[in-house]
Amino acid sequence: MSMRTEYCGLVTEHLLGQTVSLCGWVQRRRDHGGVIFIDLRDREGLVQVVCDPDRAEMFATAEGVRNEFCVQIKGLVRNRPEGTVNAGLKSGKIEVLCHELNVLNASVTPPFQLDDDNLSETTRLTHRVLDLRRPQMQHNLRLRYRVAIEARKYLDEQGFIDIETPMLTKSTPEGARDYLVPSRVNAGQFFALPQSPQLFKQLLMVANFDRYYQITKCFRDEDLRADRQPEFTQIDCETSFLGEQEIRDLFEDMIRHIFKTTIDVELDAKFPVMPYSEAMARFGSDKPDLRVQLEFTELTDAMKDVDFKVFSTPANAKDGRVAALRVPKGGELSRGDIDGYTEFVRIYGAKGLAWIKVNEKAKGRDGLQSPIVKNLHDASIAAILERTGAEDGDIIFFAADRAKVVNDSLGALRLKIGHSEFGKANGLVQAGWKPLWVVDFPMFEYDDEDARYVAAHHPFTSPKDEHLEYLETDPGRCLAKAYDMVLNGWEIGGGSVRIHREEVQSKVFRALKIGAEEAQLKFGFLLDALQYGAPPHGGIAFGLDRIVTMMAGADSIRDVIAFPKTQRAQDLLTQAPSPVDERQLRELHIRLRQPEQPKA
């Protein structure tokens, strides 16, 4: 016989007058004038249980229970007395009069109250089992489950096949570091945990599976941020015989379907599309948050001949940029606010933050308030006011440096101001969801340290057809058939059309200074497969953790993963990673070298 007949949170008026069996945990026990009330919790919610002293044996047991005891109760569902209804609970109109109470397992005193919202992350992750009992974590993980289910439903309906790819694979150290797994059988050799199923899913397209997907773990040994984990989950997809636009349309519909069916959000009927170059020019980011109603103004050309070296030097540098950020009504900002923003942009490499307050635009330079106005000639001031569209009461911030520093610092300032209380009060940020596609990424980035080009995405991304000739003559001019889906400033998915011809893939390897011998050693299996009539193909991978984090309104992806790692890639619950037995190391033919101690 089942230990329970109902979930606690689902006991409502439809069960009035019925006897139910419930199992769960004691959220709270209260003794009110000889009657004991127990808030009993399971995954569906709470129900109030009333323990009357008329049943002596049951009541004695109730007197001994404490928070987080695991118990079973049997009792009668009845209406709560008038004036005691709890509108905040699904079960708030009823209570269960307890007839039997069995303690299934006692609990030691928990290290924290489950309703404490001020717990440190260290405490939460160390006691993750208890943390997961909290309603918000229950909600987050069930939301994650629903997102995965809806993704599967959509992909199944579109003819995709769920195929598993290997977790032990070949190390191809391009980009992030691999997690390496030593082979006991093949001494001195290593597997790598996959950073993505990229090459295997391409091979599946060559193998005529046409449409593939899996929801899979991926691994990257990199420095962590709030939105990164050493192991993360992707909704990984690949399809044959579709062009870039068709692929984007297919997966845009999937994301629209997931948001509608899981959190009842209607995303735009058609996502806007923005070239990478435009995103960087307007927002300083390839994942712009379109909720923030602030944009850059380009001033590099207008500052080349000013006496102000802070502006003219980067304006005349090959990799320099001068840009402005106009903040409507920003004249209200105090000097303390401005000083705070100045310190903030230093985090991103900026040396300072120039600014101009527009008091009376009609008066020209006399109507401007700023320590830099005296260093700018009339033509440059006119360009600033005209291009920014500044009005009385605005403030204009400036960044002048290498383009990367300008983009990073002014882009971060844009978000900080937009999402601040000032920004919210003055309509500088909109509510809701703002998706877009960013396309036409550079194929390569130049690595000054190694004096060579590296792949901006990965080396299997196809260049645009009209840029194929640049692979051998000017790789820096190549644009890729790559696309990222961005939502509210987060990249939630990224993909590309792949190279499906061996000769093009070999040209890309040469552009990356990967010689024929090295290419054969690392990627020979792919080059061989491409010679057997590989179809045109492409795909995308979505970050499941990121999507659920946004839907849940969580602060970190650690809040939507059952057992996450810290920012130091540690599991505080199991204390992993940890030392291993010397015998295990000998079996793997591994000897540890202690890290060198820093010199005094």
Curated annotation (Swiss-Prot):
Its main location: cytoplasm. It is found in: Cytoplasm. L-aspartate binds at residues 174, 220, 457, 498. The keyword Aminoacyl-tRNA synthetase applies. ATP binds at residues 220-222, 229, 491, 543-546. Transmembrane segments: none annotated. GO terms for molecular function: aspartate-tRNA ligase activity; aspartate-tRNA(Asn) ligase activity; ATP binding; nucleic acid binding. PROSITE patterns: AA_TRNA_LIGASE_II (PS50862). InterPro entries: Aa-tRNA-synt_II, aa-tRNA-synth_II, aa-tRNA-synth_II/BPL/LPL, Asp-tRNA-ligase_1, Asp-tRNA-ligase_1_N, Asp/Asn-tRNA-synth_IIb, AspRS_core, GAD-like_sf. Its EC number is 6.1.1.23. The record marks 32, 83 as: Important for tRNA non-discrimination. The keyword Ligase applies. It catalyses: tRNA(Asx) + L-aspartate + ATP = L-aspartyl-tRNA(Asx) + AMP + diphosphate. Residues 198-201 are annotated as: Aspartate. GO terms for cellular component: cytoplasm. Keywords: Aminoacyl-tRNA synthetase, ATP-binding, Cytoplasm, Ligase, Nucleotide-binding, Protein biosynthesis. GO terms for biological process: aspartyl-tRNA aminoacylation. Belongs to the class-II aminoacyl-tRNA synthetase family. Type 1 subfamily. Aspartyl-tRNA synthetase with relaxed tRNA specificity since it is able to aspartylate not only its cognate tRNA(Asp) but also tRNA(Asn). Reaction proceeds in two steps: L-aspartate is first activated by ATP to form Asp-AMP and then transferred to the acceptor end of tRNA(Asp/Asn). Homodimer. This is Aspartate--tRNA(Asp/Asn) ligase. It comes from Burkholderia orbicola (strain MC0-3). The lineage of its organism: Bacteria, Pseudomonadati, Pseudomonadota, Betaproteobacteria, Burkholderiales.
